Amino acid sequence: MKKIIWGIDLLFSTSLVAGAHTCCHNSAQKCGCKRGYYTQYYGDKPELIKEAIAWAESGVWRNGFDKAKPHSSVNLADFYLQYQKNPQQWQALFDYLAKTDLLSIPKGKHKIPGSDLVVSVEDSKNEPLEKRRSESHNKHIDFQYVVKGTERFGVIDHYSSTPNCKYRPDVIHYDYDRRKARFYDSNPGEFFIFFPRDWHIAKVATDSEDQTIRVIVIKVDYKD
């Protein structure tokens, strides 16, 4: 069942994007299109999607890390392509996660041995959606693994979102339509990866009383 979910979610996401591209190229408001654009489009590359799903299911990327799998929202085609282009950083990342006690390590920033990656261990609290900012990055990929508590992540629609500030390395923020945003709650058995086309919101309050979280954040270089 886990394997099926991975594949269906990616294909569903890309089919929505395909509909949005067909309906309108510039703005959903111009044609009344209800579909959105949430992640990099690979719907015209079915073989790549199949290859990426098979690769993700095989676990060859794990490098000893078996505590979690990609959340169903993760764009597996992006994950697959970026891993092939930058294996050293990804291998170091998963090796670190496999060998580190993520619950007891002190909060703060730590260098990942054998790489130029830095892990940020954050003990934090979720906040109401209106207090959280959306963002995306051009040069880095956000790897986020919530090891304690539950964090709600949002992904916003490109067509109904507009930048509300100047780009400054390496982040830009957006005004967006909350009704078109998608939200996902974390669990310790899954991690999230936000690629440049995944405009996202982090640390959104959930429906539970306890909003305390520990999240592992690693910024991986994005390779064109």
Report the location of each language-model feature:
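Conserved metal-binding segment of the jelly-roll/cupin
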Residues: 185-204
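Short, conserved beta-strand element in jelly-roll/cupin
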Residues: 139-151, 157, 167-172, 219
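Short connector loops at helix/strand junctions that flank enzyme active sites
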Residues: 112-116, 136-140, 146-148, 213
